[in-house]
Regions:
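Conserved acidic donor-binding segment of nucleotide-sugar-dependent glycosyltransferases
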Residues: 306-308, 312-320, 328-333
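Nucleotide-activated donor-binding/catalytic signature segment of Leloir-type glycosyltransferases, i.e.
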Residues: 240-255
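Short hydrophobic beta-strand element within catalytic cores of glycosyltransferases
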Residues: 291-295
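Aromatic "clamp/platform" in nucleotide-sugar-dependent glycosyltransferases that forms part
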Residues: 274
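A conserved mid-protein helix/loop that constitutes part of the nucleotide-sugar donor-binding site
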Residues: 14-22, 194, 198-220, 234-237, ...
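N-terminal strand-loop element at the rim of the active site
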Residues: 5-13, 26-77, 165
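Short alpha-helical donor nucleotide-sugar binding micro-motif in glycosyltransferases
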Residues: 149, 255-256, 262-266, 359
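Donor nucleotide-sugar binding/catalytic pocket of nucleotide-sugar-dependent glycosyltransferases
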Residues: 124, 146, 150-185
């Protein structure tokens, strides 16, 4: 079977990028699929994740990001020009490859793909929640996105909660959780270190500013504890400077390939995301024996964390409750260890060998109908 994924670039450290690489690697290694990924902005950058040599990476050399060098008017003109060029090159590649299935994770690709794909099944991977925007412009954009997404042969969501919303616009919605890198050693956190951990991209979605604000209150009660944040993104420098200026025992790190060591050397994992379709890092942390404190953001955390058993789910933006639960764990080593043990057991629900057969089944269903 010949599969084409479409994505902007694999050059960044990020959850979507890692998941795409993992899935493509699995499809070529275990199922013998012929897999391509077509990018618009990869350029000469290499992926920080190990992409199997059998996966064909084709970059269309568009460089959408370069338009931001111009003023607003010129930026709009450049975007239209680049979009036309992108669609022309994308159509040419699809005609040459002649895939069995096309998969996209970005909404702006759906409409042009529907026009150029012919009878090929189109799969839309939803790595963002079906959000309910609060501005007129966003509501209009959401309606447009939903209209075109609803015409795809399949929409794949990460959680049942997200799927319920998508079923308002499509009858072809499937739930397939993300693949997760779980701790596959016998080494776990003993929950005795005075370290709290966050891992994620430094962007608005992760709501890191609120986490830092919560930590200010925690630090007054537990000044000998440390908050470690690992990740990258456009807000990294901003939060690095903010954390350094506050001087409240926060250390901000760039991504590392040895992230499992960071999990095992910590005692509590925290997440304050505004929305989290799945939350890869939650089961990762749990598999290393960490209890998790997370906002109950739509829709991922509640599908992974059992509140009061292996972690705590906090109502959105209740900073006081969030801080109280973190302090509760910091002040009770036995509770940390008990919840950590249960977290290890809970993490086993998302093993990779349960996920990829679901994709294989979907692909076979779609190709049998085309």
């Amino acid at each position: 079977m010949k599969i084409v994924y479409i994505y902007s670039s694999l050059a960044l450290w990020g959850g979507v990028e890692r998941i795409l690489v993992d899935k493509m690697n699995c499809l070529v290694r275990h199922y013998g699929y012929d897999v391509y990924i077509i990018t618009s902005d990869q350029g000469s950058h290499k992926s920080p994740y190990n992409l199997d040599d059998r996966v064909h990476l084709i970059d269309l050399d568009i460089r959408f990001h370069s338009r931001f060098r111009h003023n607003l008017l010129r930026r709009l003109i450049e975007y239209r020009r680049m979009s036309r060029l992108y669609h022309e090159r994308l159509k040419k590649q699809l005609m040459q490859i002649r895939p069995d299935i096309v998969i996209t994770t970005t909404f702006q690709d759906i409409r042009p793909l529907l026009k150029i794909k012919g009878d090929l099944p189109l799969v839309v991977e939803s790595h963002l929640n079906f959000l309910h925007p609060d501005t007129l412009l966003h509501r209009i954009q959401l309606r447009i996105n939903n209209y075109w997404a609803g015409r795809a042969e399949a929409i794949v969501t990460l959680t049942n909660g997200d799927a319920e919303d998508w079923r308002k616009v499509s009858h072809h919605v499937h739930v397939i959780p993300n693949m997760v890198h779980l701790n596959d050693t016998n080494l776990y956190s003993d929950c005795t270190s005075k370290r709290v951990l966050f891992v994620g991209r430094f962007e608005e979605q992760k709501n890191i500013g609120e986490l830092i604000s919560i930590w200010q209150q925690i630090h007054t009660k537990f000044p000998d504890w440390k908050l470690d944040l690992y990740g990258d993104g456009k807000l990294w420098e901003k939060y690095k400077c903010e954390a350094d200026a506050l001087n409240i025992n926060i250390e901000i790190h760039k991504p590392t390939a040895q992230i499992m060591d960071a999990y095992r050397n910590s005692s509590v994992f925290v997440m304050t995301s505004l929305y989290e379709p799945f939350g890869l890092v939650i089961p990762e942390a749990m598999s290393c024996g960490l209890p998790v404190v997370s906002y109950d953001s739509p829709y991922g955390p509640a599908g992974i964390i059992s509140d009061g058993e292996d972690g705590f789910l906090i109502p959105m933006h209740d900073r006081q409750a969030f801080g109280n639960r973190v302090c509760q764990l910091m002040g009770d080593e036995e509770l940390r260890k008990e919840m950590g043990h249960r977290a290890i057991e809970s993490s086993q629900r998302v093993y990779t060998d349960k996920i990829m057969p679901m994709w294989k089944k979907l692909f076979e269903q779609l190709t049998s109908l085309s």
